[in-house]
């Protein structure tokens, strides 16, 4: 009411002033004064507010703006919206824009149109992009006011999540390894170095029991889709896997297949290059979400008394061009590692998988591998006939062959790693056919059968056992 009185009295004063001007000033001065008064009225804040309210009263539409930059920082919401709108109905758009985005697998196609219409839960919204004089862009979302609750409560969140999901799928996966702390700078980026991860492994080509493979895939699916579930039960969104088995049974290939299946980058953590628990914490907090953190040969990397194996520490130091001094020794403890796996620091980041591998399951401390830390124990054993058939399909494109029965019989009688089977099936040159590769495998299996048949029970005395193992190794060589 007060604003209306102010507006009315001000308007009456202006009319009185204009009538006086018309009587006193000549025509050309009256025109100049009229233009001045009009511009002055337009600049009055209460007139602007009145006009805005007047327009909003009759307009049923609401508008939300998303700027490219907020407080001099890039607005990630803008990027998610741009990705969502760019990917939406690109097959129907008449104008497309192609670009090579950093960390993307290839060219990214986006709509090059400033206006996009979208449908959501029976309502219609309109997106429009505007560019100011400085080149900064802004997305404006327009919708009917009856859709306000749907748009603000769920539609905007849906756009953000879809945009981020599309970004993740097109992002180039990376393989990280930690730098020695002597190479660290002030930025967290200096903690890790990386290369593009382009391993071709997949669960389709993985040589293992089909039921076990399905069990792992179901577990990965439950984890990747379990954000709300983990939040509901009050646990950090992470999963632990222990891969154990003899050398050559596919532990590293399994990790690569998991990464490709989930589209996660891999952090290969070398514990021998870390001096203490504080450095370990800095490294792990610098990892990204949607990633796999791998510690291979955990039984060799971490001595369960809290001390590192000196030989491996010295070897790592020399590889990094450093001397194996006392200061270079690593003192990462078991408790320090466990604190990050399931302690208070485990909540740092989300949607992360932690994988330990070992060739010697029996050497591991039960505290390290108990359920809840390593949620799933996956044994990767010697090659079975079912695994062989997958390898035969991968390498020779064979579903069946007359020699398969003999190979099946030999696999039951001897132990051979899938990697050794694959080596025999791989064609060495163009002249070797499938028959030749299978015969090479049969010969290798028969050779192993003879060696295993000649072996006696392994002695239990530690001194005799030492010489026994040396004898077996020389026999295999």
UniProtKB/Swiss-Prot annotation:
Family statement: Belongs to the AAA ATPase family. BCS1 subfamily.
Pfam family, one: AAA
GO biological process: response to salt stress
Cofactor(s) required for function per UniProt: Mg(2+)
Record GO terms (molecular function): ATP binding; ATP hydrolysis activity
Catalytic reaction equation(s): ATP + H2O = ADP + phosphate + H(+)
Record carries keyword Nucleotide-binding: yes
PROSITE patterns named among the record's database cross-references: AAA (PS00674)
Protein name according to UniProt: AAA-ATPase At3g28600
